[in-house]
């Protein structure tokens, strides 16, 4: 099995985070909205991103993505889980989601997330027990209830 590891992101990781964001999200944004405005995406990403809130995902020692989990008193929120295309479809996302599910189960809290409706990652979340709890014009809201002990 491939070794997936996480480390805390640092401010100097911002450019890597931007690159992962574009590589992971551009195809889905183009399908959902018709185009990718690079300047607008860069601006919005920079305004909404504190690198130190993220973790860098590594596969066999090489950085391949990032995740951002926001901790609330009553839930975990998976804000971002981005993988470079070469890491997609290799079980990395599934390992990360399984780890997050175990963490939520230990804390006895649900996990909530929002995903573009057209993003195939939606199936990954469904395989891990997430259910649709709402929809917007472009996104699906999902939640996984903590497993009972």
Annotate the PLM regions.
Residues 4-19:
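A short beta-loop-alpha structural element at the N-terminal edge
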Residues 22-47:
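Conserved GNAT-fold acetyl-CoA-binding loop/helix
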Residues 46-56, 65:
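A short helix-loop-beta-strand connector motif used in the catalytic cores of GNAT acetyltransferases and
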Residues 62-70, 77-82:
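Conserved beta-strand in the GNAT
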Residues 81-88, 115:
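A short, internal acetyl-CoA/4′-phosphopantetheine-binding micro-motif in the GNAT/acyltransferase core
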Residues 104-116:
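Conserved GNAT acetyl-CoA-binding A-motif
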Residues 126-135:
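Conserved acetyl-CoA-binding loop of GNAT-fold acetyltransferases
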């Amino acid at each position: 099995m491939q070794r997936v590891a996480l480390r805390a992101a640092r401010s100097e990781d911002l450019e890597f985070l931007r690159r992962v964001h574009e590589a992971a999200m551009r195809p889905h944004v183009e399908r959902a909205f018709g185009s990718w405005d690079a300047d607008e995406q860069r601006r919005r990403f920079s305004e909404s991103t504190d690198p130190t809130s993220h973790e860098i995902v590594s596969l066999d020692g090489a950085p391949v993505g990032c995740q951002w989990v926001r901790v609330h008193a009553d839930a975990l929120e998976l804000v971002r889980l981005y993988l470079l295309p070469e890491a997609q479809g290799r079980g990395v996302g599934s390992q990360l989601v399984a780890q997050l599910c175990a963490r939520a189960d230990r804390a006895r809290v649900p996990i909530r997330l929002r995903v573009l409706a057209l993003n195939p990652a939606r199936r990954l979340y469904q395989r891990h027990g997430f259910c649709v709890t709402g929809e917007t014009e472009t996104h699906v809201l999902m939640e996984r209830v903590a497993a009972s002990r």
